Every structure is written in C-alpha cells, then in structure tokens.
C-alpha cells in the first residue's frame, strides 16, 4: 500500500515533502509526525507549470487532447491523505528537491531543510527541536547548510543559522564569519521568530536568544550556547 507521501506526490505533481516530514525522511528527527508537511507553488504558478507539463508530455497531441475535451491537469486541494492530516504550504520558492523512485516522492534536499528550520521553525517541530537538530547534525551536513543558506537565506536566516552553527555547534568557518555582517541592532530580532522577546541576547549576532534551554547550563548562569550572551 502506498504511503501518504506517495499518494500526495502523485495527486499533486508539483508538491514536495518539506519541513518536519523532510526532517523525518532524512533522519534528522526521531519524531514521527502525525502531520504530512508539503509545499507546492501558488495557484498562478501551479497553473503555469501544469500547462508546461502537459505541453511537454503531450507534444503534438496537445491540440487533439484539448479538442476532445479530455481532462486537463488541475490542482486538487486536499486536507487528508490516507488518513494523515496534510499541512500544505503554497510557496513560490520550494527550494532544491530530489525525486525518489522508491518510495515515489519528491523531497526537499538536506540543505534546504536546514534553511526551512530557521525560516519556519514552527513547521519543523518548534525552535527547541530545531536547536537539537542543528546540534546533532550541523557538523555532518555543514557544507550543504552553508551552500543553501549562502545562496537562498535571507539576512535574518543567515544570522539565526550562524548563531546556531557557531554558538551551539561550536563550528568555526569563514563563511559563518561572513554572515556576521548581517547582524544588526534593533527590530527585536529573535532566534525563535514565534517566541516572545527575551532580554538575553547574543552580542555577536545581535539576536535575542529566546529559547530557554540556551540560556543557562548551571555554570553560574553562563549561556549554554556561547560566552557572548548579555542582558539588556
């Protein structure tokens, strides 16, 4: 019996498995999510891609197909697949993904998954889970993370990822140092975009460290994730 991932990727030919579901596929989490996270293009882009796909697949038979009023490729929204709840995100930029033959799915590449973790942590198990994933796998996938975030990360995402790699994973790298140029005061920049602002901040990354587990580790209140934490 095909999995929910396989069915979803068959029903929507432009959707790919992302966020916590992609973390699960790549072995970046020990959680078994009860939600299937998928990303597909917005409506206008989806229709354009559908036209291109049909033109490519049918070739010279496209006109005959239309004349016969045969079904066109169209978007079918769905909230559940094989009994699994679906969280479907419409995004212009799905990022890099790969097509797997068995199971027959499309899934976000590892580097993209690490970018999505700092972009939308709530769809990746929450910020604490993101911290844990970076701590455990950041070194292993460092080159993929650096390439993806260098190329596609927004300034705030470079700052969040840079903090996690340097202060949490204890990784030193020239490209991470380069991201420090994106650190800036003001605007209440926070490590967890969905959390509340915390007065404890990283001097280096100009970032409110609003994840409780990173604030103390029993060493006289020193930050668990580096020695540059201060208070306002």
What are these regions (language model features)?
Residues 25-232:
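Phosphate-handling catalytic interfaces
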Residues 2-20:
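Short, amphipathic alpha-helical interaction segments positioned at domain boundaries
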